[in-house]
Structure formats: structure tokens, C-alpha cells
Regions:
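Short, structured loop/turn "capping" segments at alpha-beta junctions
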Residues: 59, 124-127
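A cross-family phosphate/adenosyl-ligand binding-site feature
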Residues: 1-96, 132-176
Length: 177
């Protein structure tokens, strides 16, 4: 399975996020899952790429030209897919991936989550987004989605499009379908 991972490129975050991300990368490689990611050499993106490669897995980086020109490309990509901008990157990641996992991240990660989820709700695809809720990172986002649903701003149950995994075991089960 090709698992797209959305996550932070920031280095200055809770060290536990790096530890949990390494565990996920190891699990992905050991279970034959390919990593599809933004292909950056920083933060959790770098961490997941290194963990997958260190355990014999395959990395597919969808790299915007701005990242490439800035010398911020993950150095050990098996496949590099160049793209013009972040919108192209999301579109290419959608076509390249079977499922999406969101690790802790910022505005870019939120953009990726909601772009994929919105496309699902409209019917462009039927791929799931999983919020890997490391240390409760996504709790406020989950509360926001619940509040929006309560106010009838979301049709149906948002959990039909976005699922939540509290730990690696739950994540593994959700990835198996």
C-alpha cells in the first residue's frame, strides 16, 4: 500500500513526535508500505523518510520546485516526482496514494487534510484520511469538526471521511481497512 504522510517540516517540536514518527516509519517499511510524502529534508518529513529507508522501505517524494531550488529535498528518495507548487503536490499525492495519514503539523498539514477530505465528500475519490493523534495533538481539530457537525456545517458524519488513530496499533488496523 502507498501511504501518504502529511506532517510538519519544523525541527523545533516535541521530541516525542519524532520518536512516534520513527516507530511509524519502521512499521511502514516492515509491512511493505511505500511512503509518499512532501520530500523535504526537515522536521517530521525528514524523520519519516529516514525511518522508512533505515528499515528497507521505499520513499516517493512529491517535491515542489521551490523546495528543490532551496536545497531542502530529502536526499534518499527512491522516486522523486517534481511539481510546480503546493496545489500540484496535493493533486499528485492524491493520485499516488491509497490512504493518507496526518501526523502533527501546521497550516500546510491542515490544508492537505482538508483538501483531501473535501474532495472525498464531493465524490472525487474514496480514500481515507487518518489523524494520527500523537499525544492528543489533533484533539482541538477533532473538537472543531464535532462542533461544525453539531451546527450542521458538515453533511453526514465527518468520521466517514476522516478517522482518528490514538496509537500505532489503531493506525495499523485502520490502514488494513
Amino acid at each position: 500500500m502507498k501511504i501518504a504522510v502529511f506532517c510538519s517540516a519544523n525541527k523545533n517540536i516535541d521530541p516525542d513526535f519524532f520518536t512516534l514518527t520513527e516507530e511509524m516509519g519502521k512499521w511502514m517499511a516492515e509491512n511493505g508500505h511505500d511512503l509518499v510524502f512532501g520530500g523535504c529534508n526537515s522536521g517530521l518529513m525528514d524523520c519519516i523518510g529516514k525511518a522508512v529507508k533505515a528499515n528497507g522501505g521505499r520513499t516517493i517524494g512529491v517535491v515542489p520546485t521551490l523546495v528543490e531550488r532551496g536545497g531542502r529535498t530529502f536526499p534518499d528518495l527512491d522516486i522523486e516526482i517534481p511539481c510546480d507548487n503546493l496545489s500540484d503536490r496535493k493533486d499528485l499525492m492524491l493520485t499516488q496514494s491509497d490512504i493518507f495519514v496526518a501526523l502533527p503539523g501546521g497550516v500546510g498539514t491542515l490544508d492537505e487534510i482538508f483538501t483531501i477530505a473535501a474532495a472525498h465528500t464531493i465524490g472525487y475519490h474514496h480514500k481515507m484520511v487518518i489523524l494520527y493523534n500523537m499525544k492528543g495533538f489533533w484533539n482541538s481539530t477533532i473538537a472543531l469538526l464535532d462542533d461544525m457537525a453539531e451546527k450542521s456545517m458538515i453533511r453526514g458524519d465527518w468520521r466517514d471521511v476522516i478517522e482518528v488513530a490514538e496509537n500505532l496499533e489503531e493506525l495499523a488496523k485502520l490502514c488494513k481497512g
